[in-house]
Amino acid sequence: MKSLDIDFLNHQAIPIEMGGLLQKLGEYKGRQGLFWRQTPQVLATLKQTAIIESTESSNRIEGVTVPSKRFRELMAHPTKPRDRSEAEILGYRRALAKIHAKPESFSIDEKTILSLHSQIYSRTDIPSGQWKKRDNTIEERLSDGRWITRFVPVSARETPVYMKELCMRFNRLMSKRKASPLILIPAFVFDFLCVHPFSDGNGRVSRLLTLLMLHQVDYTVGRYISIERLIEESKETYYEALNLSSNGWHEGRHSLKPWLEYFLGVLIGCYQEFERRVGEIKSTRGTKTSFVKETVENLPETFAISDVERLCPSVSRDMIRVVLNRLRKEGIISSSGTGRGALWLKRGNKRNKRGNKHGND
């Protein structure tokens, strides 16, 4: 486990293009404050959408899904889960909300990692908040249907020691400022995934940790644009980058380059989308019709009129109904049910099916 060894990092070939990505991310970070001060209402719209998208995408990557209508109900009014999938979705949202609310209250240590895992599974009967008890493998299904072992993580017996060392190395390098946080954070997440410390939930915990650590160094775009959604949209590249960088990991002969390029690329994509969305919403605020349309576009696949009302407080309910009915006539959305319990569905959206990876969570 050498990704967070300073000598190892110093010998990693960081191409000029990657240096350009780091510089660009620094510029995005520098502009954050301007948006925070000038567009608080726009950010409120984006924040609500990001929480929902992050919860849905991070779970869906691992094949944890519920029907669209039920998902919207769970997000709007958290209730008693009906099955394991619903319980894990609610648990993830709870952990995500805590990170968004007070990221500075978390330490990057074993206790925090175990706590995040425990929160995901808090409403299930699955043992949680503890390291794996049995060795595990990361497998891949080939096109002919056969399964192959892609990577063998750290053994269950060695996991506690590895996790303690991982947290210690990260905190030491962060405190000494030996390298950019945008190198150390993805290196930490990568080693975490290679250790694979849990029997289940590794992928989701890694994404919660990613968001938490980025918040702590003031790269807060994940609060408004779902990092998890961008990962889901590029999950084949995500798995490929992990696969390439994990070659030789046990011997300390691996290259972080593929994983770093992927990680930084996703973060760049989040900032680009953030600035574009803020600009689009600001430019449409002149007309209430356009504002409602933009809000609907940024909502999940299934939504209720109350979701639009919450994000468009300056627009009357009657006006929102007019716009929704117009969008329905245009074939952009359709409705299900009547009255206040009616749900609206965006048309033409296809939900991603479960990927062909097994054991990656």
Model-predicted regions and their roles:
Residues 1-361:
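FIC/Doc superfamily catalytic core
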